[in-house]
């Protein structure tokens, strides 16, 4: 871009040098003196302290007001009158831009220059200049036109001058012919103000149009001869045509070159917005034609900031090195003498806005929006606002080609879809039921399973999840009930009880579907009521204060709550809560008495089961085995032991570390019990339970078949737990609880009897409740007396059973004896299973070795370990029946 700018300036300087070399020297020196006088006026005059025509401001004025109205005919002779050698060596880029701009303003026709000044005033905000300074700027430019305009009008009207009355090549300023035949001349320096007035008018100034008197000649050229006129005419034609043709060719070449470069640098993502912000008609201004329209400001705002429009063919597009659009300036500057001022805080009066524009013509279809950057990451906190968009930047978006336009439309469609989905995500959502979990902090340095999750592969169905897990989802079935309750709200009930007590009573009454009338009838007639209801009423009996409130309430009972209505009906009955207690005893006696009777029967049966033959034989085997182990010590020679010892049999282990003393006792018992069962079967005439090889010697065959006897005895010993079933049931009872239950029944009976004989007798009523209570007391007295007798008898039975095993032990342990036997039976069942598994394993091993056909050839290890018990099996079998 810098190289193009330098080339363009060099071409302008070269073209001006050609024009300068073909012109007279005196006129050039006079014009150069006037030009430098104008420059000195710009730098040293009063305007220099208040107004500065910077390069950025020239760029903005060009893009806003001059870009679409300047034609190639207006630039004829552009840049021919200055001393470019001295100017280019002593001037900066901003000064050069200001100079070229002033020259262009001098060359423009009056109507276009007036339009330019009006545009500057109307677009003060687009130019970055306050409105009060834009008026001063336009007046300033009009005043400077008189300083520089006389240098260019003769050259611009060169052809018209030759046709005039007295053409001359003198250095004096020649008159220029207008299109109407009138002669125009610029205003004098004294007639135009150089600085803005301190007191600005609140109304916008009317457009300036030069008067007809201002277009007259300032002087008359001397007469010339016809030969010199023809010679001068040809010279002027050559001077005007040749440089103009060369300059036009170079300008066209540079125009096409710059346009081609700019088109090649267009980005696919950049787009232009050609819609004007404001349409002003030139007919609104005084003295203007109604067909001329003021071009709107080519600066438009969109989501990305301020962008220049592309209305028609723009010279700035062909000469970007000299004329920058407003998109190149990132910060608008004021044309004030130093510092920027805030328009919002300025104390200067604001000018009246322009008249409202007429409705604009229908705009062309908008181009597709530019592609957006990738969507931001999801917010950290739910409900957090989306991140603020980036600051608007002033960028230039050239027109796209058709292929790039189609690609941009596709990308913009996808971006719009993603933007809409983003908007849906960031939109406020319905609150759902919480899902409690423990979040894990992501570790970027460690590979985790969560890193492989693709966040776009699964989408939550918002409608379904809101329907299922929304806070109002569970109550959708009750919407009608809620609407009915809202439309017809229930009246507020009068509360006379404690809130918690009233709620609990109301829940029980509604659950059992009882009314106050039913409870009243039951207390008067002696009808049966549910036990839970009676217990709840007695437990939540109203206090004396609450009872007093209920008695004093004389209002409508329908205004009371359900609990208050029931309690109000109860307190009107004499001795209501004593009646409820009596009804509760009547309803519970039969159930409690049946439970006590069953427990007493189990206790009596358990005392008899402890004297079972097989259990006593186990105790005998344990006693003899223990005496053998304790032989020679002070523990030996025992005749009995406490049953607590049964729980220690599993603690004594053999040499192998597996076989316990309980295993040994079980092995000995199952052998003897198997032989006894087979012998009883033969004596009772039943067939032998196993095939006998010899009918004459049956006892010998029984002894030889040791494995069979063991299996048969194992079944008998394993069934001992079922034989002592009542012992296990009594072990779950509490002796004190049984005695307390019997005593409570007796106490309730005495209380009901006293209520009948005292309180009910004083009422002298012959109600159904009175008669029911009398008959019930007679029956309850018989029942409670029986239970008392049974309790005493069974307690004595338990004591005798304890003395049967433990001797004269005065300590009363209740049912602890049954608990010990229950735990021993559990250990016995476990030992029987282990012994049966070991025997089955030994049998399979002997069959594999081929010794199963002659079992009597091998000596039984049990006979060697415990021969005394085995020898005594047959001798004591008859006595143990």
Curated annotation (Swiss-Prot):
Predominant location: membrane
Comp. bias intervals (Pro residues): 351-390
Transmembrane segments: 236-256
Residue stretches of biased makeup (Low complexity): 400-424, 846-865
Signal peptide: 1-24
Keywords, alphabetical: Membrane, Signal, Transmembrane, Transmembrane helix
Compositional bias of kind Basic and acidic residues: 870-881
A GO CC term attached to the entry: membrane
Molecular function as annotated in GO: actin filament binding
Domain annotation FH2: ranges: 422-854
Start and end residues of each stretch annotated as Disordered: 194-223, 333-427, 683-703, 837-881
Pfam families (UniProt xref): FH2
SUPFAM superfamilies from the UniProt entry: Formin homology 2 domain (FH2 domain)
Membrane topology: Single-pass membrane protein
Keyword Transmembrane helix set for record: yes
Compartments where found: Membrane
Any one Gene Ontology BP term: actin cytoskeleton organization
Keyword Nucleus: no
Polar residues bias (residue ranges): 333-346, 692-701
Family indicated by similarity: Belongs to the formin-like family. Class-I subfamily.
Name of this protein: Formin-like protein 10
Source organism: Oryza sativa subsp. japonica (Rice)
Source taxonomy: Eukaryota, Viridiplantae, Streptophyta, Embryophyta, Tracheophyta
